[in-house]
């Protein structure tokens, strides 16, 4: 064997080792989730043992039970009729997104996130559904600022695009550069914004959202997937919304000193704490709580403790969304 042949084989083997050792999930892999409901370890690897699933440390899908139940469990927790009752006026003629957000798209998107509403007892699972739909209802509400029929908390999911975006939400980022002519304003149930969020989300769900950001307002299943991705994915120093609502997040001493304790209020802090938390009472936080209480009542579960973030300091840098 010649020297050049030996060198070529060595380089191929080296490439194989480097590529084969790439992390599989979490912040090391652009927010990707493990397949089959497996836990993502703090180092970005997928597995089902305590080394992968122990909290703190585990990044996502931290149930510790390996593959989670399929979406059939979700349909047993929230039926089509209940979904329609909760999002009562989403298809009203006054809502620009009427006809877009469907129950079928919600269930289909959940198949990509099998840990959603499958962890803990039935009350915990229903509470996660209520919290997810409440936060996203606030982001897409059509019931604020007027005497809405059936009250403001029956008007979630009225919008799928940000109103009058102040910019294109394009930041300099070598990993997720903006595509020419594309804008990354809020879209979908969670009103995902900024190119780096579109890039991370797209990588995790297998869709090129940097070049096709409008998919979040034209394809309802992909739109719901973007919201589930945000919900399930921790972005340091923030835990995931999922881990908070199922009780898998343990606040650090710094968190407690900042007033960040387990409960629905921390989820608001994760989503939009920089604008809404640590400022005392405000209408935005109250609106999020109002949706949550209504949905918990419909599902027949208690609210839990610490619903607001009025006295919580915001988290540091990480993924966030801008409210409409």
Curated annotation (Swiss-Prot):
Broad EC category: hydrolase
Chitin-binding type-1 domain ranges (all copies): 23-64
Transmembrane parts of this sequence: none
Keywords of this entry: Carbohydrate metabolism, Chitin degradation, Chitin-binding, Disulfide bond, Glycosidase, Hydrolase, Plant defense, Polysaccharide degradation, Signal
Signal peptide segment: 1-22
Keyword Protease: no
Domain of life: Eukaryota
UniProt record, GO biological process: cell wall macromolecule catabolic process; chitin catabolic process; defense response to fungus; polysaccharide catabolic process
UniProt catalytic activity: Random endo-hydrolysis of N-acetyl-beta-D-glucosaminide (1->4)-beta-linkages in chitin and chitodextrins
Propeptide segment residues: 318-324
Enzyme Commission numbers on file: 3.2.1.14
GO molecular function: chitin binding; chitinase activity; endochitinase activity
Database matches in SUPFAM superfamilies: Lysozyme-like, Plant lectins/antimicrobial peptides
Disulfide bonding pattern of the chain: 25-40, 34-46, 39-53, 58-62, 95-158, 170-178, 277-309
Residues the record marks as active site: 139
InterPro entries: Chitin-bd_1, Chitin-binding_1_CS, Endochitinase-like_sf, Glyco_hydro_19, Glyco_hydro_19_cat, Lysozyme-like_dom_sf
Keyword Disulfide bond: yes
Function in brief: Defense against chitin-containing fungal pathogens.
Similarity field: Belongs to the glycosyl hydrolase 19 family. Chitinase class I subfamily.
Protein name in the entry: Endochitinase 1
Source organism (scientific name): Gossypium hirsutum
């Amino acid at each position: 064997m010649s020297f050049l042949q030996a060198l070529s084989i060595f380089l191929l083997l080296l490439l194989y080792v480097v590529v084969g050792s790439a992390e599989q999930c979490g912040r090391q892999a652009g927010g990707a989730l493990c397949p089959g409901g497996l836990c993502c370890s703090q180092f970005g690897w997928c597995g089902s043992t305590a080394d992968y699933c122990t909290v703190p440390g585990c990044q996502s899908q931290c149930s510790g039970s390996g593959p989670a139940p399929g979406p059939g469990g979700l349909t047993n927790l929230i039926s089509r009729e209940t979904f329609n009752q909760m999002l009562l006026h989403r298809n009203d003629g006054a809502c620009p997104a009427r006809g877009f957000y469907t129950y079928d798209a919600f269930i289909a998107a959940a198949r990509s996130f099998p840990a959603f509403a499958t962890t803990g007892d039935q009350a915990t699972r229903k509470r996660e559904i209520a919290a997810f739909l409440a936060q996203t209802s606030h982001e897409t509400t059509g019931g604020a600022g007027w005497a809405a029929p059936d009250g403001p908390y029956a008007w979630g999911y009225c919008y799928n695009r940000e109103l009058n975006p102040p910019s294109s939400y394009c930041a300099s980022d070598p990993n997720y550069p903006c595509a020419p002519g594309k804008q990354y304003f809020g879209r979908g149930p969670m009103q995902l914004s900024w190119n780096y969020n579109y890039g991370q989300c797209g990588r995790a769900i297998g869709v090129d959202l940097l070049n096709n950001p409008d998919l979040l307002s034209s394809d309802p299943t992909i739109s719901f997937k973007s919201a589930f991705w945000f919900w399930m994915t921790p972005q340091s120093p923030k835990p995931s919304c999922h881990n908070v609502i199922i009780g898998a997040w343990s606040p650090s001493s710094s968190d407690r000193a900042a007033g960040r304790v387990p409960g629905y209020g921390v989820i608001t802090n994760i989503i939009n704490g920089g604008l809404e938390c640590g400022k005392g009472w405000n209408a935005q936080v109250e609106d999020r709580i109002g949706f949550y209480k209504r949905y918990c009542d419909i599902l027949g579960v208690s609210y839990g403790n610490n619903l607001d973030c009025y006295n919580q300091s915001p988290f540091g840098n990480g993924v966030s969304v801008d409210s409409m």
